[in-house]
Regions:
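Short phosphate-binding loop-to-helix
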Residues: 1-18
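Short aromatic-hydrophobic micro-motifs that form the base-stacking/packing surface
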Residues: 20-22
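Short acidic donor-binding/metal-coordinating loop in glycosyltransferase active sites
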Residues: 24-26
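Conserved donor-nucleotide/metal-binding helix-loop-beta segment in metal-dependent transferases, i.e.
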Residues: 29-54
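Conserved hydrophobic/aromatic beta-strand scaffold that supports enzyme active sites
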Residues: 49, 60-62
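Short, well-ordered beta-strand micro-motif
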Residues: 62-64, 103
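Short, glycine-/small-residue-rich phosphate/pyrophosphate-handling segment
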Residues: 64-85
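Conserved alpha/beta core of the MobA/IspD/sugar-nucleotide pyrophosphorylase nucleotidyltransferase superfamily
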Residues: 83-134
Length: 134
């Protein structure tokens, strides 16, 4: 959480208009989900948050410059982030795009993801070979 806060503050200090904190375990995320989140920010005048369905965590948060919400990621963080935004008088919207709902936190999540993707083994082999050559 400290690293996310420090990186966000650094980005704001150099004039970045907004920061999207996005975990790397969102297997069903697609560009339309991100577009929806950006649209909900109404031209970066509102923060936007997306909930993790399984544990009530936060699977994405978009913070416009000047609207830092202290990162508090982990189980139950969705409600914590909303509370922190309210305390700081930061306007916030909730993004309910399907790609943000499911994350790969537990072994059973990976199993469900694998079963839902007919190309899972092919993609896994592609990444395995690609990473071997780095």
């Amino acid at each position: 959480n400290k690293v996310v806060k420090d990186a966000t503050l650094s980005a704001f200090e150099i004039g970045i208009e907004g920061v999207l904190v996005l975990p790397g375990d969102l297997g069903f995320l697609n560009p339309n989900d991100i577009d929806q989140m950006i649209d909900l920010s109404e031209g970066l005048t509102r923060a936007v948050i997306a909930r993790a369905t399984a544990d009530g965590g936060t699977n994405a948060i978009l913070m416009p410059n000047g609207m830092l919400i202290d990162p508090s990621f982990g189980p139950g963080s969705f409600e914590r982030h909303i509370h922190l935004a309210n305390v700081a008088n930061i306007p916030m919207s909730i993004c309910k795009a399907k790609g943000f709902e499911f994350d790969l936190d537990r072994p059973e999540d990976l199993l469900a993801y694998r079963q839902s993707r007919s190309d899972f083994d092919e993609v896994l082999n592609w990444w395995t070979n690609k990473l071997k050559n780095i």
